[in-house]
Regions:
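Compositionally biased, charged N-terminal/linker segments
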Residues: 1-38
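Short beta-strand-centered aromatic/proline hotspots
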Residues: 52-62
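Catalytic phosphate/metal-binding cores of nucleic-acid and nucleotide-processing enzymes, i.e., regions
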Residues: 30, 34, 54, 77
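Contiguous surface segments at macromolecular interaction interfaces
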Residues: 70-113
């Protein structure tokens, strides 16, 4: 079991709070080298500013695209604030360099318990 640090920008504190409150039960990240080897049973150490919260990963999935991920996982468990699927894209594209990272690496989905 390993512990991995996942940082939320202060501007994204709402998403950090959704993890803490149990509303966001699936954390996703671009499948870059930093995230692609994370396994079930590992822990994610969520950090936002000085706040830290830890969750255990129940399972891990890799998707080549947002479409592939949304065909299998409910978007409300990934981005509870999203109003619809189009909103999911808008939120993802708002993160720095995410479009390019997802197009080249895909997405990792960490189902939390």
């Amino acid at each position: 079991m390993k512990v991995h640090r996942v940082v939320f920008r202060e501007v994204d504190r709402d998403k950090y709070n959704e993890v803490v409150q149990g509303l966001k039960t699936i954390e996703t990240r671009a499948a870059t080298v930093k995230f692609k080897d994370i396994a079930a049973g590992d822990k994610l150490n969520f950090v936002c500013g000085k706040d830290v919260f830890e969750k255990t990963i129940a399972s891990v999935r890799h998707y080549s695209s947002i479409d592939e991920m949304l065909a299998e996982l409910p978007y409300k468990k990934i981005l509870p604030s999203a109003k619809n699927r189009a909103d999911v894209y808008e939120i993802y594209w708002s993160f720095p360099n995410y479009r390019e990272k997802i197009e080249s690496c895909g997405l990792m989905a960490f189902l939390l318990r």
